[in-house]
C-alpha cells in the first residue's frame, strides 16, 4: 500500500506514521513559500488506485476540487463557528419613540413616510417608506435576550443615515441615522399634504443634518458595541459601497443639503460640486439639477459610485472602512453589499477589495471582511480580498432544496430536488470547493434573510409572493418539524450559523418586504426559541461542530448523515 502527496504534477511518497484499530495515518512535510499550494492525494491499495480531494475518495482527478493552502491567509478565530444574529433594526424593537420617523416627515419613492402605530401590523407591499421605530436603544434593551439565546455576533443591516427602512441607499457614511440613534435637536415642519419636494421637509433636514443629532447617534452606537463586547459578543456592520442613495449629500437629488449649513453643493445640484466625479453623468448640459447619472441596475434612487474617475472617492470610502473598525467604535468587521458589482471593471473591483482588506486589517487585525455574493467566490477568496461570503450556494440553497423543494425566494418548487440526497451532497461538495478551510469555517450560513422568504414559509412548499397570495398564505401549511431539521443542519454544518431576527420565534413571510415583519414580542413561539437555544448550546459545546471537517456518512431518499471531526473531537 502506498500514499502519495501530489502537488504541481509531482508525486511525493508519504510516510506511514501511525496505525490504530481503524486507520493508517500518513504524513509528508512541504516547505511553504508565498505561493498558493494546491494538492491532492493518490492512494494505491494492491491493484486499486484512487484519489482523495475535497470531494473525499474519488476515481478521477479534477483540478477544481484540489485542496488549497494559502500561506499567511487566516480568518478571525472568533468567527469560526460563531453564532451570528442578523438584526433589521427598524423591525426589531422600539426602545426610544422620540426618534421615530414621523408620518409626512418627507417624501420617498412617490409618497410620504408613514409611522406605523400598530407594531403587530404586517408590512405593506410598498413598505419601504413605512417605519415601525426599531432602533439601537431597542437593541440595548434586548441584550439580555440575545445573550440568553447564545448569540456570539450581532450583524446589523445598514445603520447609516438613509431615507428608507432598509438603508441600502446611504445618505451619509459618516454617521448613524438619528432615526435609529438619538435626536437631541428636533425642530422644523412636516410636509404639508400638497408638498412633494423634500427641500421643504425642514423637520427631516434638521434631524439628519444637525451635527448634534449625528454625533449623539454615533456615541449611542459606540455604547451598543461596548455593551456587546462586555457580554462577549462581536458586532459587524453592513457596508454599501457599490452605490449610495439619491438623498446622499454627494448627490443631493432631493436638495436636502443645498442650503444646510456646513455642507457643499451636491453633484445633482451644481456642475462645480466637489463630488462631481463621484458619479458618471451622461449629459453635461442639464445643470443645475442634472438627473442624467448612472444608477445601479438603472435605479435613479441608487446612484452608482464612479471610483475609477475619482481618487478622492476611493480614499474617502477607504477612510470609512477604517473609521468604523477603529476606536472609538471598534466594530468587528464588515458585511459588504453586492461586493462583486463595485467599480466598472473586474480589474478595479479586485484592486479595490485588496485595498479595502489592507486598510481594515491594519486598523483592526481581527476584523472580518464578509461579502454578499452569488456564484463562485473563489477569485475573491485568495487571501488578499474577502475573508468569506454569505453562503448561498454551499448552504442556503442546498438545504432549502433538500428539505422543502423550494427556491429561496419561494419562486419555484422542485419535487425532484426535495429529499434528493445525491443532489444535496453534489451541491455542497461542488460549491464548497470554492472555499479554503479558513473561509469555510467563517462562512455565513443562513436559512433566511432580508432578501429571501422566511424558511418557515418555504416549508409549506407553496410558490408565491405577497402580491400574488397575500400575507396569510405565508403561514398556512407550514411544517415546524422540517424547520427544526433545518436548524439542526444549520447548527451542525461547517461555518457560522446565522439566525435572521425572528426566525427563532417562528416568524413567517414571503420574500421582501414581507420577510421584514416586526419581531413578535409577546407572541413568540417559545418552543422554537428554546429549540434554537438548545441547538446553539450543542453547537457551542462540541468543538467538532465549530471547527471540524465534514465527511459524508450516508445519502439516501430523504436522508443524509454526516460526521464532523476536529482532532480528538468527533460528532455525527
List the model feature ranges, each with a label.
Residues 89-91, 154-166, 238-248, 337-342, ...:
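Short, solvent-exposed turn/loop segments enriched in Gly/Ser/Thr/Pro and often Arg
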Residues 81-82, 147-154, 229-236, 330-334, ...:
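Loop/turn elements at helix/coil->beta-strand transitions in domains of secreted/extracellular proteins
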Residues 2-6:
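Beta-strand signatures of extracellular beta-sandwich domains
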Residues 520-553, 568:
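Aromatic- and carboxylate-lined catalytic core of secreted/periplasmic carbohydrate-active enzymes
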Residues 89-152, 159-328, 356, 362, ...:
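Substrate-binding/active-site clefts of carbohydrate-active enzymes
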Residues 77, 247-252, 321-322, 328-330, ...:
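Conserved alpha/beta catalytic core and glycan-binding cleft of carbohydrate-active enzymes
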Residues 9-86, 93-112, 118:
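The feature marks proteins involved in alpha-glucan
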Residues 87, 146, 156, 173, ...:
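Conserved, mostly hydrophobic/aromatic
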Amino acid at each position: 500500500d502506498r500514499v502519495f502527496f501530489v502537488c504541481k504534477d509531482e508525486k511525493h511518497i508519504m510516510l506511514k506514521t501511525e496505525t490504530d484499530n481503524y486507520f493508517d495515518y500518513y504524513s509528508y512535510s512541504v516547505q511553504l513559500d508565498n505561493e498558493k499550494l494546491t494538492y491532492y492525494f493518490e492512494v494505491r491499495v494492491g491493484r486499486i488506485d484512487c484519489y482523495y480531494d475535497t470531494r473525499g475518495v474519488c476515481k478521477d482527478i479534477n483540478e477544481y476540487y484540489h485542496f488549497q493552502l494559502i500561506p499567511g491567509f487566516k480568518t478571525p478565530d472568533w468567527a469560526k463557528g460563531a453564532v451570528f444574529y442578523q438584526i433589521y433594526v427598524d423591525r426589531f424593537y422600539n426602545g426610544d419613540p422620540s426618534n421615530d420617523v414621523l408620518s409626512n416627515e418627507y417624501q420617498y419613492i412617490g409618497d410620504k413616510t408613514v409611522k406605523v402605530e400598530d407594531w403587530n401590523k404586517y408590512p405593506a407591499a410598498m413598505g419601504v417608506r413605512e417605519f415601525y421605530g426599531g432602533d439601537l436603544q431597542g437593541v440595548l434593551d434586548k441584550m439580555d435576550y440575545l445573550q440568553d439565546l447564545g448569540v456570539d455576533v450581532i450583524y446589523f443591516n445598514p445603520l447609516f443615515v438613509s431615507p428608507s427602512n432598509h438603508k441600502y441607499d446611504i445618505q451619509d457614511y459618516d454617521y448613524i441615522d438619528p432615526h435609529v440613534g438619538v435626536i437631541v435637536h428636533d425642530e422644523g415642519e412636516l410636509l404639508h399634504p400638497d408638498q412633494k419636494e423634500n427641500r421643504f421637509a425642514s423637520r427631516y433636514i434638521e434631524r439628519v443634518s444637525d451635527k448634534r443629532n449625528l454625533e449623539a447617534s454615533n456615541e449611542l452606537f459606540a455604547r451598543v458595541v461596548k455593551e456587546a463586547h462586555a457580554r462577549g459578543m462581536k458586532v459587524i456592520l453592513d457596508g454599501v459601497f457599490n452605490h449610495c442613495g439619491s438623498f446622499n449629500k454627494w448627490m443631493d437629488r432631493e436638495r436636502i443639503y443645498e442650503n444646510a449649513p456646513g455642507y457643499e453643493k451636491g453633484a445633482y445640484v451644481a456642475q462645480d460640486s466637489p463630488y462631481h466625479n463621484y458619479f458618471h453623468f451622461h449629459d453635461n448640459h442639464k445643470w443645475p439639477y442634472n438627473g442624467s447619472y448612472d444608477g445601479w441596475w438603472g435605479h435613479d434612487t441608487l446612484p452608482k459610485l464612479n471610483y475609477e474617475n475619482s481618487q478622492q472617492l476611493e480614499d474617502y470610502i477607504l477612510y470609512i472602512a477604517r473609521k468604523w473598525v477603529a476606536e472609538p467604535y471598534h466594530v468587528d468587521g464588515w458585511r459588504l453589499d453586492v461586493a462583486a458589482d463595485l467599480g466598472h471593471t473586474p480589474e478595479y473591483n479586485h484592486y479595490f477589495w485588496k485595498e479595502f482588506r489592507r486598510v481594515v486589517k491594519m486598523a483592526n487585525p481581527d476584523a472580518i471582511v464578509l461579502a454578499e455574493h452569488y456564484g463562485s467566490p473563489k477569485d475573491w477568496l485568495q487571501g488578499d480580498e474577502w475573508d468569506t461570503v454569505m453562503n448561498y450556494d454551499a448552504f442556503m440553497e442546498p438545504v432549502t432544496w433538500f428539505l422543502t423543494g423550494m427556491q429561496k425566494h419561494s419562486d419555484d418548487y422542485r419535487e425532484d430536488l426535495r429529499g434528493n440526497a445525491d443532489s444535496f451532497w453534489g451541491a455542497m461538495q461542488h460549491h464548497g470547493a470554492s472555499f479554503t478551510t479558513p473561509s469555510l469555517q467563517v462562512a455565513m450560513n443562513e436559512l433566511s434573510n432580508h432578501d429571501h422568504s422566511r424558511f418557515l414559509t418555504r416549508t409549506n412548499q407553496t410558490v408565491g409572493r405577497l402580491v400574488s397570495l397575500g400575507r396569510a398564505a405565508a403561514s398556512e401549511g407550514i411544517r415546524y418539524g422540517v424547520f427544526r431539521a433545518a436548524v439542526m443542519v444549520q447548527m451542525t454544518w461547517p461555518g457560522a450559523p446565522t439566525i435572521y431576527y425572528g426566525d427563532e420565534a417562528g416568524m413567517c413571510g414571503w420574500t421582501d418586504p414581507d420577510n421584514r415583519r416586526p419581531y413578535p414580542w409577546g407572541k413568540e413561539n417559545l418552543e422554537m426559541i428554546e429549540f434554537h437555544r438548545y441547538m446553539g448550546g450543542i453547537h457551542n459545546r462540541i468543538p467538532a461542530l465549530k471547527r471540524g471537517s465534514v465527511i459524508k456518512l450516508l445519502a439516501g431518499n430523504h436522508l443524509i448523515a454526516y460526521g464532523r471531526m476536529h482532532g480528538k473531537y468527533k460528532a455525527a
